[in-house]
Amino acid sequence: MARIAGVNIPTNKRVVIALTYIYGIGLSLANRICEGCNIDHNVRVVNLSDDEIIRIRNFIRENYIVEGDLRKEVSMNIKFLTDIGCYRGLRHRRGLPVRGQRTHTNAKTRKGRSKLPVAAKKK
């Protein structure tokens, strides 16, 4: 298995698909990385040379924020919103949808299951 950005990417998949296993890299970004490194999109990770893997690794390190650094940045952004007390921060703190979705009938997963008392069985 090739190791890129601290993640073991699967060797039997195409390069574009394998790069999406890294947090912060989707399909469009994976295509851009392959174009930037001059690597064919359809080649499998098994068939990559060590030089090509090093090129991909360096390209990602120099141009993008991925994995732990990205997770830390996202959590710091959410912490900043909660600290300044803005509306989005309050919604994050309360565990409700942040971007204006309705909550009267939907948002069950974000709100969590309510603790309703279960009716006792009649004897």
UniProtKB/Swiss-Prot annotation:
GO terms for molecular function: rRNA binding; structural constituent of ribosome; tRNA binding. Pfam families: Ribosomal_S13. It comes from the Bacteria. Residues 97-123 are annotated as: Disordered. Keywords: Ribonucleoprotein, Ribosomal protein, RNA-binding, rRNA-binding, tRNA-binding. Gene3D superfamilies: 1.10.8.50, 30s ribosomal protein s13, domain 2. The keyword Ribonucleoprotein applies. Coiled coil: none annotated. One of its GO terms (biological process) is translation. GO terms for cellular component: cytosol; small ribosomal subunit. The keyword rRNA-binding applies. NCBIfam families: uS13_bact. PANTHER family: 30S RIBOSOMAL PROTEIN S13/40S RIBOSOMAL PROTEIN S18, SMALL RIBOSOMAL SUBUNIT PROTEIN US13M. Part of the 30S ribosomal subunit. Forms a loose heterodimer with protein S19. Forms two bridges to the 50S subunit in the 70S ribosome. Belongs to the universal ribosomal protein uS13 family. Located at the top of the head of the 30S subunit, it contacts several helices of the 16S rRNA. In the 70S ribosome it contacts the 23S rRNA (bridge B1a) and protein L5 of the 50S subunit (bridge B1b), connecting the 2 subunits; these bridges are implicated in subunit movement. Contacts the tRNAs in the A and P-sites. This is Small ribosomal subunit protein uS13.
